[in-house]
C-alpha cells in the first residue's frame, strides 16, 4: 500500500509540474484576475467492482494546454474535491496505475460554482464521458411544468419596502388596501422557502427576497387546500466563498423609515448568514359607507323606526412598526450532504385611531339618529421560526432526498377601546374596552424523495405532517351608569383552534411521443376543532372519520402535460382537484365583531367547497419578445360565499355571515407580454380577462350573479447612461363579480429612479401612486338594501433609500487573516481594505 501511495504522489506531481501557473495568477485565468471560488467534486470507482479507486490522481488542466490548475488524490472512500477554482474551460484528467487515463471537459461560470461530477468509472477500456456544462443565466421569466418563476431582483420600486412591494407588480397578482394578496382574483397561500408560514408579506423585507414562484395550479406535492395557488417566497441565500453583505437605509414621507444589514460568510464546510431589518411607517386612511334600505312591511319583532338611509364616514391614522431578524448556517457534511439550521424572529406593532361619524335618516330624509364613534387599537406581536433541513444528493443527476422540520410560534396582544357619542336621541357616552391575547404555534415536518429513472422519467414521493394550535382570550367590558367597567359576557370569548393535516403523495413523470406528462395523487387526513371554552360551544370535523366515511374529501389527483414545439414554443395542459375547508370564524354561530350597523356571525352548517382547476398554457419566444398566455377554468362545488341581510329584530343592522352556494364558475385568459426592443429597455404588459358566474340559495330562491372583469399591469424600465434606471409601473382592476354585488375600480401608477455607483452604492427614489387615485370598495345591490362602501389607505408617498454592497469572493479568507496576523498584520492588500 505504501508503494502504491508513493507512486500515486509521483503521478500527481508529474501532472502538476508539467507547467507553471501562467502569469503568476495562482489559479486565475492566464493574464487575468478571475475570482477563484469554483468547486468540483465527485467519486472515482472501479467500473467493474464498483469499489473506490484509492489514491487515483485527479488533475484539472486548462482546456487548450497541459498547464495544471489544481490536483488531489482520491480518498479512501473514493471522494475527491477541488476548491478555489477560477472560471473558464478546463479538462479534468483522472489516472491511476492499471487503469485507462480518462479526461472530462469542464465549463465553469458564476451561475453554478459547485458541481457534482457524480461517480466516475475507471476501466481498462476507454469510455466516453459526457460533457459537464454549468447552466446559463436565469431568465427573468422561467416556465416549468407546474410553476412559473419571476425574478424580482430588477424591480427597483421594491427596494426599502416590504414583501407586498415585491409582489404587487408581478403579473396576475393584486394587493388590496389591507395588504390582502390575490392571484387571479383568488386568495393565495403564502409560502417561504417552500414551507407554510405564519409570516405575512408585510412582515418580510423586500430586500431579502430573491425570487417569487407563482404556482397557479399546485401539484400533489403541496397542500390540497391551496385552492387559490401559491406564492412561494424564496429568501436570498449566498453560497459564494468569502464574505459579502449589504447595508441599507431609507426615509420617506409621513414617518417612513427603514434600515437593513446583512452578512454572509462561507469558509470550508460552513456557510453562515444573518440579517436584521427595521421598518416603520404611518398611514392616513379614510372611507365611507352609504346604505339605502328597502321599504319593509311592519315587523312583529321590531317596533322601532326602520331607517331609510344610513351614512358613515371614517378617518383613520395607523402606525406600523416591524423588526425582522434572520440567522443560520449551512454545514456541508460531505460533497453530497448538507445540513441547514436557520431561524427568524419578527417583532412589531399596529396602533390605530379610527374616527367614525354616522347618520340615520328616515324615509322622508329627516334626521333620525346619529353620533360619533372613536375606535382605538393597540396591537403588539412577535413571531419566531426555527427550521432544520437536510439534503442528500446522489451521483445520479437529479436524485435527492430532503427532509425538514419547521417550528413556528407567536404571540399577539391587542387592546380595543370603543367610545360612542350618541347625538339623537341624546344618550350618555358609551365606553367599551376589549383585551385580547393570542399565543399560537405550528409545526411542519416534510420528507421528499426524487428518483430519476432516465432522462425523461422520474418518480417522486413524500410525506407531510402539519399541526397548528392557537389559544385566544378576549375580555370585553362596558362602562356602566356609575362609571365602573363591567364585564360584557356577550362579547367575552376564550376560544381554541386545533388544525391537523397528515398527507402523503406519489408523483410520476415521463415522456411519450414527445409529450412530457406528470401524474400524481395526494391523500390528506384532516382534523379541525374550534372551541369557545367559556360558553361550552364547539365545532369539529375529521376527514375521514373513525368509520372511514367521507373518503371523497381525502383524495386529490393532479395531471400535467407539456409539449415543446418548433421555434421556441411550448404548450401545457394541467388539471387538479382541491378542497377549501371552512375555518373557525366561518363556522362558529356567535357574534365576533360588531359596530353600529354591522355584525358578523358564523354558520356551523358549512360544508367544504371542492374546486376543479384546469389550465391551458402557451409560451413562445421570438428573439427579444416573450409571450405567455393561459386559459384557466375554476369550477367550485358548494362554494363558501359571504352574504349579508338585515337583522330581523332590528332591520337597521346588517348581518354578515357565510353559506354554501350551489356552484361557481370562473373562466379566464391571462396574458403576459415581455419585450426588450433595445439594450437597456424592458417592457412588460399583463392582462387577465375572466368571466365569473356564482349562484346561491336565498330561502328557496336561487340567486345568480355573473359578468366579465379584467385586471391589467404594465411596466417600463430603462437603463440610461451613467447607471441611471427609470421604472414606471401601472395597475388597473375593473369591477369584479361578488355574490351580491361588485367591487370598485382600483387604479394607480408608481415611478422609481435609481442610480448605481460602481455596482456597490445604489440610490433609489420612489413616488408611489402618482395621481393619488388608489381606492378600494364594494357595491351591493340586493332586494333588501343597496350599499356602497369605499376605503382609501394613504398610498401616495415618497421613499428614498441608499444601499451599499460589500464583500470579497475568497475561500481562503480566514487562512489569509491568520497568516497576516502571524506576519504582523502589515499586508492588508488581499482583504480589500480589511474585514
PLM region spans:
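Short, acidic Ser/Thr/Gly-rich low-complexity loop/linker segments typical of extracellular
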Residues: 63-79
Amino acid at each position: 500500500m505504501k508503494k502504491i501511495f508513493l507512486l500515486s504522489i509521483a503521478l500527481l506531481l508529474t501532472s502538476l509540474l508539467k507547467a507553471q501557473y501562467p502569469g503568476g495568477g495562482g489559479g486565475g485565468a492566464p493574464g487575468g484576475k478571475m475570482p477563484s471560488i469554483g468547486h468540483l467534486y465527485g467519486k472515482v470507482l472501479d467500473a467493474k467492482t464498483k469499489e473506490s479507486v484509492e489514491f487515483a490522481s485527479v488533475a484539472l488542466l486548462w482546456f487548450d494546454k497541459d498547464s495544471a490548475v489544481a490536483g488531489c488524490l482520491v480518498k479512501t472512500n473514493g471522494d475527491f474535491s477541488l476548491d478555489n477554482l477560477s472560471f473558464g474551460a478546463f479538462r479534468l484528467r483522472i489516472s491511476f496505475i492499471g487503469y485507462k487515463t480518462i479526461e472530462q471537459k469542464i465549463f465553469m461560470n458564476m451561475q453554478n460554482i459547485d458541481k457534482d461530477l457524480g461517480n466516475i468509472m475507471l476501466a481498462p477500456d476507454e469510455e466516453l464521458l459526457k460533457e459537464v456544462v454549468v447552466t446559463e443565466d436565469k431568465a427573468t421569466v422561467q416556465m416549468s411544468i407546474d410553476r412559473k418563476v419571476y425574478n424580482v431582483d430588477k424591480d427597483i420600486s421594491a427596494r426599502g419596502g416590504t414583501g407586498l412591494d415585491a409582489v404587487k407588480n408581478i403579473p396576475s397578482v393584486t394587493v388590496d388596501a389591507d395588504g390582502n394578496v390575490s392571484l387571479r382574483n383568488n386568495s393565495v397561500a403564502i409560502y417561504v422557502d417552500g414551507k407554510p408560514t405564519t409570516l405575512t408579506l408585510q412582515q418580510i423585507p423586500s430586500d431579502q427576497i430573491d425570487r417569487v414562484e407563482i404556482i397557479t395550479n399546485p401539484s400533489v406535492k403541496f397542500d390540497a387546500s391551496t385552492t387559490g395557488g401559491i406564492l412561494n417566497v424564496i429568501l436570498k441565500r449566498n453560497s459564494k466563498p468569502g464574505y459579502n453583505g449589504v447595508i441599507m437605509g431609507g426615509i420617506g414621507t409621513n414617518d417612513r423609515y427603514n434600515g437593513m444589514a446583512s452578512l454572509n460568510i462561507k469558509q470550508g464546510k460552513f456557510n453562515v448568514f444573518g440579517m436584521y431589518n427595521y421598518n416603520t411607517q404611518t398611514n392616513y386612511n379614510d372611507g365611507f359607507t352609504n346604505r339605502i334600505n328597502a321599504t319593509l312591511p311592519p315587523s312583529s319583532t321590531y317596533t322601532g323606526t326602520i331607517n331609510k338611509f344610513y351614512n358613515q364616514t371614517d378617518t383613520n391614522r395607523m402606525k406600523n412598526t416591524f423588526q425582522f431578524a434572520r440567522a443560520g448556517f449551512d454545514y456541508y457534511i460531505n460533497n453530497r450532504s448538507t445540513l441547514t439550521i436557520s431561524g427568524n424572529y419578527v417583532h412589531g406593532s399596529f396602533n390605530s385611531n379610527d374616527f367614525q361619524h354616522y347618520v340615520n335618516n328616515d324615509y322622508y330624509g329627516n334626521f333620525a339618529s346619529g353620533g360619533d364613534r372613536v375606535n382605538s387599537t393597540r396591537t403588539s406581536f412577535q413571531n419566531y421560526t426555527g427550521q432544520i433541513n437536510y439534503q442528500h444528493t446522489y451521483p445520479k443527476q437529479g436524485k435527492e432526498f430532503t427532509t425538514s422540520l419547521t417550528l413556528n410560534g407567536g404571540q399577539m396582544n391587542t387592546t380595543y377601546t370603543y367610545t360612542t357619542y350618541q347625538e339623537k336621541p341624546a344618550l350618555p357616552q358609551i365606553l367599551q374596552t376589549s383585551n385580547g391575547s393570542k399565543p399560537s404555534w405550528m409545526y411542519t415536518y416534510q420528507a421528499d424523495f426524487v428518483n430519476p429513472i432516465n432522462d425523461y422519467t422520474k418518480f417522486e414521493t413524500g410525506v407531510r405532517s402539519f399541526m397548528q394550535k392557537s389559544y385566544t382570550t378576549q375580555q370585553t367590558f362596558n362602562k356602566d351608569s356609575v362609571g365602573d367597567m363591567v364585564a360584557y359576557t356577550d362579547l367575552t370569548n376564550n376560544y381554541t383552534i386545533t388544525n391537523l393535516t397528515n398527507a402523503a403523495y406519489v408523483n410520476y413523470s415521463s415522456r411519450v411521443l414527445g409529450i412530457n406528462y406528470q401524474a400524481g395523487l395526494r391523500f390528506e387526513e384532516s382534523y379541525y376543532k374550534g372551541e369557545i371554552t367559556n360558553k361550552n360551544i364547539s365545532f369539529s370535523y375529521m376527514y375521514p372519520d373513525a368509520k372511514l366515511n367521507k373518503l371523497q374529501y381525502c383524495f386529490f389527483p393532479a395531471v400535467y402535460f407539456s409539449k415543446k414545439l418548433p421555434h421556441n414554443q411550448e404548450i401545457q395542459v394541467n388539471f387538479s382537484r382541491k378542497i377549501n375547508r371552512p375555518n373557525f370564524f366561518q363556522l362558529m354561530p356567535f357574534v365576533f365583531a360588531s359596530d353600529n350597523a354591522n355584525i358578523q356571525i358564523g354558520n356551523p352548517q358549512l360544508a367544504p367547497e371542492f374546486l376543479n382547476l384546469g389550465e391551458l398554457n402557451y409560451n413562445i419566444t421570438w428573439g427579444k419578445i416573450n409571450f405567455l398566455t393561459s386559459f384557466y377554468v375554476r369550477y367550485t362545488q358548494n362554494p363558501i360565499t359571504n352574504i349579508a341581510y338585515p337583522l330581523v329584530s332590528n332591520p337597521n343592522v346588517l348581518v354578515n355571515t357565510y353559506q354554501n352556494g350551489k356552484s361557481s364558475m370562473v373562466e379566464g385568459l391571462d396574458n403576459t407580454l415581455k419585450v426588450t426592443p433595445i439594450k437597456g429597455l424592458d417592457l412588460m404588459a399583463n392582462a387577465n380577462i375572466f368571466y365569473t358566474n356564482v349562484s346561491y340559495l336565498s330561502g328557496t330562491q336561487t340567486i345568480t350573479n355573473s359578468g366579465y372583469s379584467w385586471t391589467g399591469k404594465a411596466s417600463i424600465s430603462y437603463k440610461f447612461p451613467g447607471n441611471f434606471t427609470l421604472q414606471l409601473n401601472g395597475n388597473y382592476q375593473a369591477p369584479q363579480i361578488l355574490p351580491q354585488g361588485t367591487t370598485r375600480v382600483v387604479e394607480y401608477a408608481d415611478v422609481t429612479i435609481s442610480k448605481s455607483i460602481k455596482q456597490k452604492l445604489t440610490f433609489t427614489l420612489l413616488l408611489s401612486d402618482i395621481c393619488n387615485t388608489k381606492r378600494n370598495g364594494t357595491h351591493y345591490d340586493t332586494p333588501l338594501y343597496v350599499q356602497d362602501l369605499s376605503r382609501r389607505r394613504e398610498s401616495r408617498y415618497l421613499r428614498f433609500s441608499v444601499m451599499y454592497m460589500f464583500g470579497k469572493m475568497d475561500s481562503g479568507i480566514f487562512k489569509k487573516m491568520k497568516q497576516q496576523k502571524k506576519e504582523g498584520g502589515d499586508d492588508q492588500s488581499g482583504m480589500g481594505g480589511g474585514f
